[in-house]
Swiss-Prot record:
The keyword Coiled coil applies. InterPro entries: OPA3-like (IPR010754). This is Putative OPA3-like protein CG13603. It comes from Drosophila melanogaster (Fruit fly). Residues 168-187 are annotated as: Disordered. GO terms for biological process: regulation of lipid metabolic process. Pfam families: OPA3. The lineage of its organism: Eukaryota, Metazoa, Ecdysozoa, Arthropoda, Hexapoda.
Length: 255
C-alpha cells in the first residue's frame, strides 16, 4: 500500500485559519483600550461605514437626496470600528493564506512542467543520437558491401552460392529483412544457374542429367508393377479354371 506525502502545508494553513478569529478578538480588545487605536484606527472607518450604510439604505428605499447623516457617538464608533478591524484581520489572514497556497501550487506545477520538459528533451536527444548512429552504420555497411562486391567481381573462383547483394537499409514495414525475402528464388534446382562455374555445372547435372535417370527409374518401376498385375490376373484365371474342371466329374458321378 502506497502512502502519500503528509500535507503539512495544508494542515498549517488550516491551523492558522482556525486561530485567526481569536487573534482578531485579542487585537480588537486591545484597540478599544488604546487611545491611538480608538482615535485613528477605529473611529474613522466606523464613521465612514455608517455613512455608506445609511446612504445605501436611503437609495434602496428611494429616499435619496441631500440627507445629512448623523455621526455615531464615540462608544458606538469605537465598537463598530473594533468589529471592522477584527473582520479585516480575519479577511487578511484568509486572503494571505489563499495567495500563499496559490503561489505554492504554481511553483510546484512549474517544477513538474520543467521536469517533464527536460525528460522530453533528453529523450529527443537520445533519439537524434541513435538516428545519427544508424545512419553512420548504414553508410559503413554500404561501403563494406561495395568493397566486398568489388573483390568478389575480381576473383575468378566464386565459392559462394549466391552473389553478394546490395545493402538495403532496414525497413520497419518489412519484418523479414533476409536476402531470400528481398530476392526470392527464381529457379527449381538447388544450385543457382547464375552463380559461379561450379554452381552452373551442378545446376546442369541436377536438371539435365540426373533428371533423366530419375525418370528412367520411375518408368522401370511402373513397368514392373504392370507385369506383376498381369501375372496375378493370369494366376487367378488359371485357378478358377482348375476349380470348375474339378467340380464337373463329381456332379456326373452323383447323377
Amino acid at each position: 500500500m502506497v502512502i502519500g506525502v503528509f500535507p503539512a502545508a495544508k494542515l498549517g494553513i488550516l491551523a492558522i485559519k482556525q486561530v485567526s478569529k481569536p487573534i482578531a478578538n485579542v487585537i480588537k480588545s486591545n484597540a478599544k483600550s488604546s487611545p491611538f487605536f480608538r482615535k485613528y484606527i477605529c473611529m474613522p472607518p466606523a464613521q465612514f461605514y455608517n455613512w455608506v450604510e445609511v446612504k445605501t439604505k436611503m437609495w434602496a428605499l428611494n429616499m435619496g437626496g441631500r440627507v445629512n447623516v448623523p455621526p455615531l457617538n464615540e462608544a458606538m464608533a469605537i465598537e463598530l470600528g473594533a468589529n471592522l478591524l477584527g473582520e479585516f484581520i480575519i479577511f487578511s489572514i484568509g486572503a494571505g493564506l489563499l495567495i500563499f497556497e496559490y503561489s505554492r501550487q504554481t511553483i510546484k506545477e512549474n517544477k513538474k512542467n520543467e521536469l517533464a520538459q527536460s525528460e522530453k528533451m533528453e529523450l529527443t536527444n537520445m533519439l537524434t543520437e541513435m538516428n545519427f548512429r544508424l545512419e553512420r552504420q548504414d553508410a559503413q555497411i554500404r561501403e563494406m558491401t561495395r568493397v566486398l562486391a568489388d573483390l568478389d567481381s575480381r576473383n575468378i573462383f566464386r565459392w559462394h552460392k549466391e552473389p553478394i547483394q546490395e545493402y538495403v537499409p532496414f525497413d520497419p514495414d518489412t519484418p523479414d529483412q533476409s536476402a531470400s525475402a528481398r530476392n526470392p528464388k527464381k529457379f527449381d534446382s538447388l544450385y543457382d544457374p547464375q552463380g559461379g562455374m561450379a554452381f552452373r555445372a551442378l545446376h546442369f547435372l541436377d536438371t539435365q542429367i540426373f533428371v533423366d535417370g530419375r525418370n528412367r527409374k520411375a518408368k522401370e518401376a511402373l513397368q514392373h508393377l504392370d507385369e506383376v498385375a498381369v501375372q496375378l490376373e493370369q494366376s487367378l484365371g488359371e485357378a478358377a479354371t482348375v476349380a470348375v474342371a474339378s467340380s464337373l466329374p463329381t456332379k456326373a458321378a452323383d447323377l
